[in-house]
Amino acid sequence: MNNFDLNNRVAIVTGGAQGFGHAIVKRFLDSGAKVIIWDIDKKFIEKAIEDSGSKNLSYQIVDITNYNEIKKNFDEISSKNKIDIFVNNAGVAGLNDKVWNYPNEE
């Protein structure tokens, strides 16, 4: 029994091609969501798509350290779909302060 019904929901998962993000993607797909992976490694994305076997999984190559790239891709998706879920899972190396202390450009 699945009490986690996401039928007709659209989710974006950053860093969704592997690790914890990929586990989230699989759970969302199993629960009926349409999922878009945002990741920078096409090799891992292709493997994730192949492993899922789901027609409800798509991807965009997105560098989440680039604000303009995030905005462009988010606007592209939201012009066609209502985004119901956004999981900000991807990690960014090199931050030495609290994330809210950084301007968008960083």
Predicted regions and their residues:
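Canonical Rossmann dinucleotide-binding motif of NAD(H)/NADP(H)-dependent dehydrogenases/reductases
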Residues: N3-V35
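Structural signature of beta-strand start/N-cap positions in the alpha/beta core
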Residues: V10, K34, S58, K82-D84
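Conserved glycine-rich Rossmann-like NAD(P)H-binding loop of the short-chain dehydrogenase/reductase
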Residues: S31-K47
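Glycine-rich phosphate-binding loop signature in dinucleotide/nucleotide-binding domains
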Residues: E76-K82
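Rossmann-fold scaffold of SDR-type NAD(P)-dependent oxidoreductases
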Residues: T14-G15, I83-G91
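Short, conserved SAM-binding/catalytic segment
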Residues: A48-S54
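Conserved mid-core segment of classical short-chain dehydrogenase/reductases
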Residues: A93-E106
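The beta1-alpha1 cofactor-binding region of Rossmann-like NAD(H)/NADP(H)-dependent oxidoreductases
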Residues: K42-K43, Q60-N73, N104
